[in-house]
């Protein structure tokens, strides 16, 4: 179910404060966060946010097409190594 419009999008408070601080000083630096559930809002455009995927922080440069999506959508947590080409045991 979608989030109520009267509540607005969820953005972690600490992340929002960091971005507002950098926008006020007109600085660009990588912002490290564990908040994968935060929604990308228009004030984040142009910033690089390093999102934790369970093992490392993946840097994500936020563009205008990402607005409305969650930060976790852009840092995959699982690595797919492919299927085994000749696996005769699974055929039986």
From Swiss-Prot:
Cellular component GO terms, alphabetical: chloroplast; mitochondrial small ribosomal subunit
Primary location class = plastid
Where in or outside the cell is it found? Answer: Plastid, Chloroplast
Which of UniProt's keywords are assigned here? Chloroplast, Plastid, Ribonucleoprotein, Ribosomal protein, RNA-binding, rRNA-binding
- GO process annotations (BP): ribosomal small subunit assembly; translation
Keyword Chloroplast listed:
yes
Which branch of life, at top level? Eukaryota
Give one GO molecular function term. structural constituent of ribosome
- Pfam families in the record, alphabetically? Ribosomal_S19
Stored InterPro entries: Ribosomal_uS19, Ribosomal_uS19_bac-type, Ribosomal_uS19_CS, Ribosomal_uS19_SF
Would I find Cytoplasm among this entry's keywords? Answer: no
Q: Which family does it belong to?
A: Belongs to the universal ribosomal protein uS19 family.
Which NCBIfam families does the record cross-reference, listed alphabetically?
rpsS_bact (TIGR01050)
Name the job this protein performs: Protein S19 forms a complex with S13 that binds strongly to the 16S ribosomal RNA.
**What is this protein called in UniProt?**
Small ribosomal subunit protein uS19c
In its UniProt entry, the species of origin is given as Chlorokybus atmophyticus
Lineage from the top down?
Eukaryota, Viridiplantae, Streptophyta, Chlorokybophyceae, Chlorokybales
């Amino acid at each position: 179910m979608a989030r109520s419009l009267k509540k607005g999008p969820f953005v972690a408070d600490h992340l929002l404060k960091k971005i507002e601080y950098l926008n006020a000083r007109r600085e660009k630096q990588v912002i490290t966060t564990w908040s994968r559930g935060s929604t990308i809002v228009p004030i984040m455009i142009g910033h690089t946010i390093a999102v934790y995927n369970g093992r490392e922080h993946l840097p994500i440069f936020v563009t205008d097409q990402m607005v409305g999506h969650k930060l976790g959508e852009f840092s995959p947590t699982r690595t797919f190594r492919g299927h085994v080409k000749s696996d005769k045991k699974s055929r039986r």
